[in-house]
């Protein structure tokens, strides 16, 4: 009972300030306790221009996953509001349909972001083709994945671009979804720019 009373008395003394000023000890970490560090989180904008009208939310989720793989918390934060970035990208494409490093840098500065990833989807479709040969009754799938990809990172003044034009013709079941083709190409492109291994 005495130990409990003594413990309560110490807690009251510490909480009420009777034990003295401990503000000088706040900056001293306890042994074994981790120290918190503040990171500067750079904003990242990912702008997709859909020229096909067929980009779905599932497609966007897959592509955003690739962007987040290279530009992740705590160093980068993907912005939810793309209003300024879309305006900057539209201005950029009005001046130059195939932007270079300086155009992307200017667009990133106008958008107020540390990294800017832009993708223009021109064609993304697949359809089945039936074989009518006498000895071939296979069903094939023809796929089209056409997209222009641009990326700029102010950290290191890095820039990369790629004009993807992939057409494939495979037996049904062995074909790759055009959205996935674009997804993996985008991921590898960003990894290449950031010096990371290919997927």
Regions found by a protein language model. Give the residues of each.
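Extracytoplasmic/secreted cell-surface and envelope-processing proteins
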Residues: 126-132
């Amino acid at each position: 009972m005495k130990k409990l009373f003594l413990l309560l008395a110490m807690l009251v003394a510490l909480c009420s300030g009777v034990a003295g000023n401990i503000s000088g000890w706040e900056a001293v970490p306890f042994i074994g306790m981790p120290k918190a560090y503040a990171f500067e989180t750079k904003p990242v904008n990912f702008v997709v221009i859909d020229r096909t009208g067929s980009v779905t939310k599932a497609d966007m989720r897959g592509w955003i996953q690739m962007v987040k793989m290279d530009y992740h918390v705590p160093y980068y934060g993907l912005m939810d509001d793309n209003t300024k970035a879309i305006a900057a990208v539209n201005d950029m494409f009005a001046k130059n349909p195939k932007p270079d490093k300086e155009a992307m840098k200017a667009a990133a500065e106008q958008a107020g972001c540390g990294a800017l990833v832009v993708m223009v989807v021109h064609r993304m479709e697949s359809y089945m083709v039936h074989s009518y040969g006498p000895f071939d009754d296979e069903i094939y799938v023809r796929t089209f994945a056409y997209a222009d990809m641009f990326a700029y990172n102010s950290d290191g003044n890095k820039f990369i671009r790629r004009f993807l034009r992939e057409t494939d013709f495979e037996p049904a079941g062995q074909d790759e979804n055009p959205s996935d083709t674009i997804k993996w190409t985008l991921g590898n492109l960003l990894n290449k720019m950031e010096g990371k291994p290919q997927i």
